[in-house]
């Protein structure tokens, strides 16, 4: 057993890559620890900086999970964002699903905004709230 808990807990708080992808989709990318103060870590994911708490003693490079629906996509440059290019765009019922090329590899993003549609080849900026970045133990 990789992890026990309710489906909601497994989805929102995966402990490793297997669990992160077992229930739903997750973007698993590497993050570099650039600073540590007590149990507060500063992580760098491509051009984006994230502050996250962890009671674990983390190595210099960690894997993190970014859920597709937690990633915000925007045409306007954000101060703290990942630069990306739309690779595919698909309308799926009540949302758009995008696959993007970025400095951390391919990222999968789901947007509920069906009015502001991004086109293949378009340059965009991705951001995520610090609390939505989940450190994985592998």
Language-model regions, residue ranges each:
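Non-catalytic connector elements of ABC transporters
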Residues: 26-28, 36-138
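Internal alpha/beta loop-helix hairpins
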Residues: 1-48
């Amino acid at each position: 057993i990789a992890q026990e808990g309710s489906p909601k807990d497994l989805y929102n708080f995966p402990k490793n890559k297997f669990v992160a992808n077992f229930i739903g989709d997750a973007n698993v990318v590497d993050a570099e620890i650039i600073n540590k103060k007590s149990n507060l870590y500063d992580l760098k994911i491509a051009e984006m900086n994230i502050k996250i708490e962890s009671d674990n003693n983390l190595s210099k490079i960690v894997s993190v999970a970014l859920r597709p629906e937690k990633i915000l996509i925007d045409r306007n440059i954000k101060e703290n964002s990942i630069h990306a290019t739309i690779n595919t765009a698909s309308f799926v019922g009540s949302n758009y699903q995008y696959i993007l090329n970025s400095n951390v590899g391919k990222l999968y993003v789901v947007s509920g905004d069906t009015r502001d549609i991004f086109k293949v080849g378009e340059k965009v900026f991705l951001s995520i709230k610090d609390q939505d970045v989940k450190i994985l133990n592998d």
